[in-house]
């Protein structure tokens, strides 16, 4: 894959696609992780006095201008992190954007408006891509989180300019390739989250090489049901129970150790946190639902994690948005951070737990991609990565 090191960038206009799809509250950025992740690329370009034109999407405006999804607050946050002005325009490819691109001096940074305000972005529209390309001399994609989208700023524009990956994109692909290609053993797969359907592809692609599969979150209930256990009022994908059984059979045939929760935290409802209690999985009351894994499960999983040479963790062990149901996820986060092997953690709640505990620096790679990371682990080709591997 071509990287930014392969481009002539000195004093040139560089269109940089970033993934600044960050949470905003009251017009302020509340989590700048994705912005910080692009700083190595931007600082490298600024050292070479490039004229940087940033473009990103934010939220799902569906081709309409929505005031609360403008990128000005993101530009302000980036400005503080870079220690220099970031000029944001309220335009994507129109006169204001063209004027900003023309006036940019070497070592300056500008930011286009939210790409998804224009419906042509998500259509991978050739005309829109040409208008973006006309603003710059070359293109850098540092938006791994959007690499699974065949959109104009991800795919079409990369074919119109000398193009390459930024350092974040490079790091993401290298980490994921290591997981997919490495023969380091034991290889442990830790999967959580609500739905089996979201993780089936990952399990099917990685199970043939895994030594252990540890399951938590709502998806574990579907596997417990496949093992013939009662799960009370818990979230279960009934139509996926046969699929879960097939995976359990496949794992058994391949000698893969599958660990399901041994004890769980139950409550009558998600909001009835004061009534929560820990029960063995064999004794889930019919009027209660599972909202987290229990301490015995955390200990058992932690012992398996400690011996891993290669580990992938994606998805929380419980309902992470409710503080009382975070303990299982936190316990797994501590175990993963303590693992001496190479650890790759998919974003979302898994990453949030590591950051909350101050352990983010202790994992091998903390991915910024949500859907993109899952699709890569499924063995699928990502359009935004594939285009950077095409012959120039």
Curated annotation (Swiss-Prot):
Query: Mainly localized where?
Result: cytoplasm
Locate the residues binding ATP: 199, 321, 347-350
Which reaction is the catalytic activity of this chain?
(2R)-3-phosphoglycerate + ATP = (2R)-3-phospho-glyceroyl phosphate + ADP
Give a GO molecular function annotation for the protein: phosphoglycerate kinase activity
Q: Is Ion transport among the key words of this record? A: no
Compartments annotated for it: namely: Cytoplasm
Provide the alphabetized UniProt keywords.
Answer: ATP-binding, Cytoplasm, Glycolysis, Kinase, Nucleotide-binding, Transferase
Provide GO CC annotations from the record: cytosol
Q: Which residues bind substrate?
A: 19-21, 34, 57-60, 116, 149
Q: What is its EC number?
A: 2.7.2.3
Q: In which pathway does it act?
A: Carbohydrate degradation; glycolysis; pyruvate from D-glyceraldehyde 3-phosphate: step 2/5
* A family per Pfam: PGK
Question: Which SUPFAM superfamilies is this protein grouped with?
Answer: Phosphoglycerate kinase
What Gene Ontology terms for biological process does this UniProt record contain?
gluconeogenesis; glycolytic process
Subunit? Monomer.
Name the family the entry cites: Belongs to the phosphoglycerate kinase family.
* The protein's name in its UniProt record: Phosphoglycerate kinase
Coding gene?
Answer: pgk
